[in-house]
């Protein structure tokens, strides 16, 4: 069994492509792959978001606005995950499509519409997105990122605990690189950056990922 943790900026086009690559690999590979899309929110993510939108990095008002919006989208995603991984993943992908492709602005109405389209129990969802459990899940994700030394979105950590006693960190990867690593045709000691950590060391942290 392989475990893939993909750390994402929910509102970055590159991360959308990364998600597609992981989903494609899980479908194509003969190996059993368990994967998580872990939202990342830090100053690097915020500044890259501003840069991609052509906004000055010293525009503190816009930086704060982007930070709050990303935080809200992440809490929405975590709340959707409480109703199942597939529903949560579908919600995230639908929100990304609405905001990045259709250029819709984040709003309560958009969140409700997307949740309903993804067959999410709306009453439960609206309560959970403002609850402590969603905030705790967000904080757990950020701790996991810190423990794995993740500072940038579009980073994936791959564990094959049946064979190896370490995790492999891939940054800004493509489908071919990820597939080669998972299928064993890429030597992690020579071809990719390696994050030396035992599977046991992350056992507790893995439990935090929902």
Model-derived segments and spans:
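Short, cysteine/histidine-rich loop/knuckle motifs that typically chelate Zn2+
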Residues: 14
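Ligand/cofactor pocket segment of small-molecule handling proteins
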Residues: 1
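C-terminal cap of thioredoxin/glutaredoxin-like
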Residues: 5-11, 22-26, 102, 106-210
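Structural alpha/beta surface segment adjacent to cysteine/selenocysteine redox centers
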Residues: 17-103
């Amino acid at each position: 069994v392989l475990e893939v943790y993909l750390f994402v900026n929910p509102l970055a086009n590159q991360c959308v492509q990364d998600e597609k690559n992981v989903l494609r690999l899980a479908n194509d590979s003969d190996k059993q792959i368990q994967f998580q899309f872990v939202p990342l929110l830090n100053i690097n993510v915020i500044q890259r978001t501003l840069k991609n939108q052509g906004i000055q990095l010293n525009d503190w008002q816009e930086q704060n606005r982007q930070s709050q919006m990303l935080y809200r989208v992440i809490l929405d995603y975590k709340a959707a995950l409480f109703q199942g991984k597939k529903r949560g993943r579908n919600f995230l992908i639908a929100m990304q499509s609405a905001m990045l492709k259709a250029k819709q602005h984040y709003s309560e109405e958009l969140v409700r519409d997307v949740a309903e389209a993804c067959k999410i129990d709306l009453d439960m969802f609206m309560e959970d997105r403002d609850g402590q459990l969603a905030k705790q899940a967000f904080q757990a994700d950020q701790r996991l990122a810190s423990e794995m030394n993740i500072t940038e979105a579009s980073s994936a950590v791959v564990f094959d605990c049946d064979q190896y006693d370490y995790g492999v960190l891939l940054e800004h990867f493509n489908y071919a690189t990820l597939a080669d690593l998972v299928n064993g045709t890429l030597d992690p000691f020579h071809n990719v950056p390696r994050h030396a950590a035992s599977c046991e060391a992350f056992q507790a942290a893995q439990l935090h990922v929902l």
